[in-house]
Amino acid sequence: SSTVPLMRLGVFVPTLKSTNKAIAKKSNVGSNINASDDLRHLELAKSEGFERITISGPRLDMDTDFKVWTGIISVLTDNELESNEDGTISIRFTEFAMRCGFSRGRLKAEFREKIKDSLRKLMSNVVEFSKDRGTNIEVTKFVQLIGESTVDIGNDKVILTPSKTLKDLYVGEYKILLKLRALKALARKESAQALYTFIEALPPNPIPVSIERFRKRLSLTSRPALQNSTVRKALKQLEDIGYLEYQELKEGNKIAFQIIKRNPSLK
């Protein structure tokens, strides 16, 4: 089952540019979100039978906190990076900032403070798992969004430790981030977006996909020759953003496409 990203749960909200002090103050109060339906597939919830899952803590914004979260996710799910037995990973501060999507020009002292604020807020968010609430066999488990974090300016380092029980949450979030990145790269290219979601859901080493299947997926109404060129153009756009490697196969008047490789990270 696919993971629901934390941002769709409303954990991250747009920054209020309001001059109204009362509203701004209220937005800092924090949030308590019922995520039972969306996070019940997590290993911890399944293995220990937790029925209710909530996320509570300071409200997180899209401007900085969400970007820092994407940086954390990209570090904690990167198998190329060296980690010790509890999953702790050390990375250069400048590289961490780039993984968050911040430009190089932003690495000033004030910006470092912003990243520290975001880490503090993210670590103050707690995922609460509970079962048999209100009975005398009630069990409640509290897990921080991330285990530990260190910002070491002198050594140009950010050190992150995951919460072990949330490993599958990180992996699910990462998949969603890759998807968002691809869809952003395909802005206003609706046919390519639709084929992206279709191709990404295919199993590993898929059998060739007929052009008819692609046409059906796009629900096109134009004449077949035009539909075929729409499909080819969309596949070419997926190739251009670095997502897809494919080959067109022709046999008689049958046309199909062999999916050679998918690169969700658009490398």
Predicted regions and their residues:
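Charged, alpha-helix-forming regions
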Residues: 1-267
